[in-house]
Amino acid sequence: MTQPTMNRRTFVKGGLAASAMAALAACGKKGGDTSAASGSAAEGGTLNYYINNPSAIDPYDLEEDQGMMVGYQLFNALTTYDFTKSELVGLAAESWDVNDAADEFTFHLVKGAKFHDGTTVTSKSFKQGWERILNPNTSTEHASAIGYHLAMVDGYSELSAGEADELKGVTCPDDDTLVVKLSQAYADFPYVCMHPALSPVPDCALEDFDTFFFAPVGNGPFKMDGKWEDGQQINLVRFDDYSYGEKAKLDGIHFNIQKDVQTAYTEFQAGNLDVAQVPTTQLKDAISQYGESEDGYTATTGKEVLTGDELSIYYLMLNVNDEQLKDKDLRHALSLAINRQAICDTVFEGTREPAGGIVPPGIKGYVENEWADSRYDVDAAKKILDEKYPADANGKRNLSIALTYNLDGDHKAVMEMVMADWSALGIETSSNTAEWASILSNTYPNADFQAGRLGWIADYPIMDNFLYPLFVTGGDNNYGQYSNADVDKGLLDARAIASDDDRVAKYQEVDKLIAEDMPVIPLFYYKHQMVCSQRVKSLYMDPQKLCDMSTVELSA
């Protein structure tokens, strides 16, 4: 992406007793099915794939999409999500079951699976991997930033604070059984377990942190070939003793680290890369030259540009305690005044999609245009404003809104278009710009803003991941200080519902309540901007921007 977006989460604790629940899941492969591609495929070969320099490829720090892409090939977590079937399936776990209270999960592991060093993957491997993330003594240089994934596991607080030596909520009755006890009901917990950061680690990860950090030993379909050469390259080769399905079709992957998107795309055009991101200003030309994927996610010969929806959103937060923005009607008017399509077309040349709600396409439970006032309707906005904030002789309404944002990437252009739309209706606007790090660490946490921009990327493909962290009272990511007792109760009720369909239906009810309050203004959803070379016979990139490269085939 061309701008920084938040993907660190803190799940605020809370929960109710769940109804009876039991679930089993069959083992499955990551990603989608690419078997339908036509043409002959070459045996093996090495895929040349562009990434920026990642922050980490070790599960200890897997949080941004560049490192996640590498880690996804090296490690297999307990579960994975099949987007082509909208179904969570087992990966390192062949099945799981849940107690009646939905606060204890028993995962049954694939037996005899191996790490890349030949040692056996056991339940202890998961326990020590999770404890390695939380234990403040794991690294002398920095604590892991991703412990929030385990915040609901019993014993999280004690271990992360250095007051305990183990995560007491995780036990290992035998080598092939992992039992996880939560501190509250959360029926969606198996979705949390799909994150690559929660993969198992072998004993060597505990023996030498620095060595493992640059050359991780995992249980995935590919293994390291040498170590990560910081700023230059990461090489992987097929792991022939892979235990969770078919072996990779590729011989290996060369992750070619480039400094920026434009440089990488130039390398792609020169024939030096097989997969690269397309700069926004060149996407239309790329589609014309290379052809567009039929489903947006699967690249095949002659249809090589991926433009599918991603599980992410760009939105405006509103400080609901602000003297002006505490007025719900004004918040609705501000949303109605914004021409989202113009932003998508002008700033992003159609590579974004106007957001009709906070939950993006690709999430089970998504409803198109669910937030009725997340649309462009100047007349409706003007009607609200005329009734409550009539304009004076100069067309001014005695309203002023300051927008907080960073100047990186395209944010200035987006915010200027938003302010122009508001100004056209007699609202005085101004900018409050700062460095992104300062905004995230000071401005937003202290609620020192009226309105501000933010991006949100899904950790897990569930509605809860877009509703609970952003809108529950007191939530660490609820920067606008929104609070609605009915929303809080609905979210907690939903978390404890056993049935997937009933749980999603409850989240949809809560989503409607939030839409009525309009505590944030959805602006647009993100889309893929990737291209594959003609060497690639078939490649599938899911809505989370992850690709199971064990299924990738090169053309003969």
Where are these regions (language model features)?
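Extracytoplasmic/peripheral linker and loop segments enriched in polar/acidic and small residues
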Residues: 11-12, 344, 430-440, 465-534, ...
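Gly/Pro-rich hinge or "lid" segments in bacterial periplasmic/extracellular proteins
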Residues: 82-83, 175, 181-248, 252
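Surface-exposed binding/hinge segments that line
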Residues: 125-127, 134, 141-202
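Ligand-site clamp/hinge motif
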Residues: 205-210, 241-290, 419, 428
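Long beta-strand-rich cores associated with HINT superfamily self-processing modules
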Residues: 530-556
